[in-house]
Amino acid sequence: MHGRAPSIVGVIGAGTMGAGIAQVAIEHGHETVLHDVDAAAIERGRARVREGLARRAGRLGLDADSIDDWVDGRLALLRDAPTIDALAAEAGLVIEAAAEDLGLKQTIFRSLGVAAAPDAILATNTSALSVAALAVVSGRAGHVVGLHFFNPAPVMALVELVVTEATLPAVADRAEALIAGWDKTVVRCADSPGFIVNRVHRPFTIEALRMLEAGEASVERIDAAMRADGFPMGPFELMDLVGIDVNLAAARAVWDGLGRPDRLRPSPIQERLVADGRLGRKSGTGFYVHGSDGRPTGVSADFATPDPGTVDEAAVRDRILGAVRAEARLVAESGLATEDDIAIALRLGAGHPRSPFD
């Protein structure tokens, strides 16, 4: 299999990300094997794949009968495996998409190190954990990479290819060629906290929270300023959409991993909201109040104010984008990723309207 794309793809974890990755693989003609310790999760995962394929077929303009045939034809490529060992024994590419728990992922990679074919590519979809910490326990670190898909995987074009110091260049090249063949845009980065997007985009929310903490600008002014600059949504709208708890967990992981620099210190406002169960759209309230359809109906009472603050929209943009640019320069100057890959990653992964290096 050396130098060739694997024909069989294994996906470990049948949650939202695992199912999405499996859908992408079968859409591109790969026989795909799915494993999850929870049999019910497998069934839910298959249902997600079917729904995703049906949406995709609908966008292709197929009629109802043709949609069913198209979906069924691709679903025939998807099957489940009872164990990790069974999956690993036949897959040329294994993508681990289990929960973001280092101990769990290390257990999986220990098993893969024993059971996978000698030339198999072993990948993790982690968004925050150390790829090297998984590679070392596998016993075959040269064949381990990160393949960080963005949610929803069938829709988002970006994949971060994360290489460790031990990753063999030929393995990284094979992984990149395969994922590019799935109509994804692949950017490379070294194994470091947050990779590209989750690190460089971090000041987008942190700097906004700092201004809110200091009473310098309101939630509405900050969000309006960034939308006016070409972003699809402002920092507070984004945190409510993603989940304030999810955003806080990522902020903590990057902050801890980089040695707790003050510039990336998580905000006490987020800590308080998470402690109160105010997680954004999924809980009904966060920085905004959300209706039954999930759409914001107004700013939450404790953030609503007739005073928009002393910092105008232009200064809000300068503060936030200045912090993003500074982080982008740090990543580029450290040799973790190229300027071009950083710019592409921010555009496709976080909706940035322009390069931070412009």
Report residues per predicted region.
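N-terminal glycine-rich phosphate-binding loop for ADP-containing cofactors
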Residues: 1-358
